[in-house]
Amino acid sequence: MRRKIIAANWKMYKTCAETESFIKEFKELSKGYEEKEIVICPPFTSLYVANKLLEDTPIKLGAQNMFWEKEGAYTGEISPIMLKDLNCSYVIIGHSERRQYFSETNDMINKKLKSAFEYELIPIFCVGEKWEEREKGKTEEVITEQVKKGLQGLEKEKVEKIVIAYEPVWAIGTGHSAKGEDANEVAKLIRRIISEIYDEEVSQKVRIQYGGSVNPQNIKEFLAQSEIDGALVGGASLKPQSFWDIVRS
């Protein structure tokens, strides 16, 4: 049985003070709750504060990105050992905004996935198609390429721990979410691809999230789907009550 996982991606929102305020309130709301796994991914600048506040809770800390090298002359980048030092358990890799604004390629994402596993971070690996690709019937082609190139060279013992977030690019931050059944079909496709690369057992262990304008009103539609194991939540995770309503749905 795959445990459900709800992750908050705060993107470029919240100062340290705002992070502290959110976590204190959210800790009160979620006290004693352990049914689903909860992950909070604040900006890099708030990771230290978040780590200190989450130490006495089952809530996991995640980062929104990382570089693939351990250290070096990479101005502005954050390494996996820096994330481990801050007690991060998860790291988001390949988010569509990174692909779009920072020209991240499947090859770069593959390097990041390998590095995350090397330093015992669990990747939340994002895949998803653009609207024009969906309109042209290319969803399967795009997802297949992203999954295959992203996972290239990774052993199955590592892949079975991964979380894959299906985030249709056209649904992110737009207020337009995919329908539950459509998201479930893509989740099935992802499992089929993993089964072809590795085996059925691995494909059944991988947890798949839906992301893209998830909110308290539509979360149940996604969690009711057989192949969807949680959500990667953007804007609706910025307020403690809203995020808590999603978690406990």
Curated annotation (Swiss-Prot):
The keyword Mitochondrion does not apply. Its main location: cytoplasm. Homodimer. The gene is tpiA. GO terms for molecular function: triose-phosphate isomerase activity. Involved in the gluconeogenesis. Catalyzes stereospecifically the conversion of dihydroxyacetone phosphate (DHAP) to D-glyceraldehyde-3-phosphate (G3P). This is Triosephosphate isomerase. One of its GO terms (cellular component) is cytosol. It comes from Dictyoglomus turgidum (strain DSM 6724 / Z-1310). It catalyses: D-glyceraldehyde 3-phosphate = dihydroxyacetone phosphate.
